[in-house]
From Swiss-Prot:
Pathway: Amino-acid biosynthesis; L-tryptophan biosynthesis; L-tryptophan from chorismate: step 2/5. Anthranilate 2 binds at residue 167. The gene is trpD. Anthranilate 1 binds at residues 81, 112. Its cofactor is Mg(2+). Catalyzes the transfer of the phosphoribosyl group of 5-phosphorylribose-1-pyrophosphate (PRPP) to anthranilate to yield N-(5'-phosphoribosyl)-anthranilate (PRA). This is Anthranilate phosphoribosyltransferase. It catalyses: N-(5-phospho-beta-D-ribosyl)anthranilate + diphosphate = 5-phospho-alpha-D-ribose 1-diphosphate + anthranilate.
Amino acid sequence: MVDFKSIIAKVATGATLTRDEATDAFDAMMSGDATPSQMGALLMGLRVRGETVDEITGAVTTMRAKMLPVTAPADAVDIVGTGGDGSGSVNVSTCASFVVAGCGVTVAKHGNRALSSKSGAADVLAALGVKIDITPEQVGRCVNEAGIGFMFAPTHHPAMKNVGPTRVELATRTIFNLLGPLSNPAGVKRQMIGVFSRQWVQPLAQVLKNLGSEAVWVVHGSDGLDEITLSGTTAVAELKNGEITSFEISPEDAGLPRAPADALKGGDAQANAVALRAVLEGMPGPYRDVALLNAAATLVVAGKARDLKEGVALGTQSIDSGAAEARLKKLIAVSAAA
């Protein structure tokens, strides 16, 4: 068993943990072998210094080892944001997920209830009529029969209950805010991940490379959005063929118009569900455009589109043909029958 006191002592000096030390420390926390004081000390020590790629890689290794897995096709994708960007926006990645699924790409989406907005992925899906409190086996059925499934984080990461109270008491962002999107229970190797701060764009791409991902975009909008934004440029770190490259994109690269961040302000789960359904039914406007933009990037990651413009064309067809909305209806039906 790890000597947790020595781990804290090391972090207290400003030293960094090796990947193995981080794996062991997080195993102790998630197994209930560390006290609340010890967990709080380590989490804040890491936060104040700044978590390293090795520390995050080790922590994710533990998260993945303890999660309840879902069976999904090898080419499935996830579209997820860390949340916590404070924007209170509509549910961009959730809407984009249905657009991508409507293009014939399997989506295994991992998410939770709201962090800083009034409506997280789980909240809006429940409001749409999707049953989210289902078993991993039932989620697998959704993925395979509907082409899209939603993995509700608390169901798949039961060991998180050991750190939950400490996280609530700390009431500030910790490494765990980064770990969720990196710990997809379906083990997807193609990911489109939005982060709440630009400082994490490159490091998280490196973490996913360390953990065997094949194709990844990690993004952060210049307006603070944990998605690709319409209001300005978006920083991207792309993992492709084992190499990570960094660049910026703008809506114009996808042939889409810009829109101010306020145009994407969301409401509660019910209001966001109405807005999402309207997009899938063909309503034009900034919400449709931002969903198309994020779907396009995901289609590039999936190898379905060569570039953003082709991705937007495919996404447009997905919505206008009714295919995206059909994926939602199928997910509601399959999850209800689960």
